[in-house]
Amino acid sequence: KNNFELVFLVMNPGYNDLNYNVILNNAKILDIPITVFKTEIFDTVVDITESPCYLCARMRRGYLYSKAKELGCNKIALGHHYDDVIETILMGMLYGAQVQTMMPKLHSTNFEGMELIRPLYLVREDDIKAWRDYNGLNFIQCACKFTDTCTTCNNEENQSKRVEIKELIKTLKQVNPHVESNIFRSVENVNIDTVIAYKQNGVKHNFL
């Protein structure tokens, strides 16, 4: 039996009142004692023209690590799920020319002693949505100032690369019902002997 303490940490990067109240209401429904801290991330990235979403994500992660460590935590649990994993695998291949996956846990390189874990790694997105609806919760998406009404927006309308990958997987599933599990397992069955090049510990090994 492992004894541990939980801190339900919420970062407010600059939500409007509507979105912030959604978070507070969810916590009330679940009777969760959240710890909220505020940052100005949305204001910082709103005028960035090149890759604002990437910068925002990096800043959010950094602030979360810093605050968690300040509170004496040694792990951060994020909500990435099974569908996020397979989408990330395909995005890396089709848009990044690389084979890699989202790991279920990893040690921080910038915050000594901190570990990131993903407890929902094997949980399907549809199951999470069903749990949300059963409990009468509302999820916000990014909710930044580019999409300030994201409590009600349809994420399918956001033509991002991830949405494109979601649609591709849906199409492939019509032909092969096992395509999702096959994508997931593909990174479990990498045969180094048949790979032209690979990186290990930052060093590239190339057959050619």
Predicted regions and their residues:
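A short glycine-/small-residue-rich loop at the edge of a beta-strand within enzyme catalytic domains
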Residues: 55, 77, 119, 123, ...
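Short, solvent-exposed coil/turn elements at secondary-structure transition points
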Residues: 12-14, 40-42, 108, 122, ...
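The feature marks non-catalytic terminal segments
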Residues: 137-208
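Catalytic subdomain that performs nucleotidyl-dependent activation
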Residues: 84-164, 168
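Conserved short-loop catalytic and cofactor-binding motifs
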Residues: 11, 52, 116, 120, ...
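ATP-dependent adenylation/nucleotidyltransferase module used to activate substrates
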Residues: 1-99, 103, 126-134
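Short, basic, helix/turn surface patches
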Residues: 58-71, 105-111, 165-186
